[in-house]
Amino acid sequence: MPNVRLPFTQDEYAERLTRVRTSMAAAGIEVLFTCDPSNMAWLTGYDGWSFYVHQGVLVGPHGDPVFWGRAMDARGALRKCYMAEDDIVSYSDAYVMSSERHAMSHLAKLIADRGWANACLGVEMENYYYSARAHQLLSDDHAGTLRDASLLINWCRAVKSETEIKFMRRAARIVENMHTAIFEYMRPGLRKNELVAEIYRAGLLGGEDEEGTFGGDYPAIVPLLPTGLDATAAHLTWDDQKLEAGAGTFFEIAGCYRRYHAPLCRTIFLGTPPKDMLVAEEALQEGIANSIDAARPGNTAGDVARAFYAVLEKFGIARDGRCGYPIGLSYPPDWGERTFSIRPDDETVLWPNMTFHLMPALWMDEWGLEITEPLLVGTSGPATCLADYPRKLFVKA
């Protein structure tokens, strides 16, 4: 469409579409319906806050993808997507939050009108944006078979292009600025909501690289910054209470540029940290270094995890769960790509230009400690840290 400013070239979108169709053919899927906004954006360029209603992209055997969504959002698709107007299809507001009709009936008719009534249709059954009711109605109305295509496109996104890596490096510049602002403003007596305002300010102001300045985007997850005993829990946000001396606060945040994320977590202690936290800091620093060294092309996600857990075992620290996940393009409620995990039993092979968040946080009985890194798998040797920020427990009097 004229006057559409796409974040990537037409050639890159065409290569992505080919990659998806290759995966569809391998899975025996003739037509694919994705409602994950990350996958929609990756395939078409669409970027809008419309994922609270039913929407999606159809990929058929031939031709461009088809955007399908609410009528008022079709105008946004015309402004953001590369497809022609005939491939931007909408349903009326009569379908929105109605107990009498459902948008999936409209989608089923669209699929039939395109000549795909009897096609094997792939749907993302394990997805935040695809409801049980939607699946039931689509199953009833579509004459062909439905097949689970969860993560099919997500896996196609695993290896990043050079432009995607550039966007993630910019996101990393942004998150560095966010942490600099946190350390500057954090002090006893400051209300947490005021600190969060500074975090958002730094994140949206953006950053600078050799090409000039650039602005930030909203991250898929809000800032997580629990303090003291609250920091023994992983996913608490903030309140309007004042920060007090004698406690640590971890900051789980990400810079975001054109929907590409670079998460980076650090912890600040106001006062003197307890000795066991300092020992844990030493363990994390050594474990992270081990993991980065293990994150080489041809190694596995499990190799990276085992390298980290070997250090924890040496320090006598017990920890359950994974210690990382892939990152890139994302929308709320999560900035992860939801494919592989950095854990000992995951044998996913690492390829050059894969990106993941090494996230070996420790949530102990009396405090929490987060020191993490966004990593890029190279063509050889250890992974590269996308961000350049001191890897330590910060202490502020």
Over which residues does each language-model region extend?
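Active-site neighborhoods and metal-handling regions in enzymes and metal-associated proteins
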Residues: 1-397
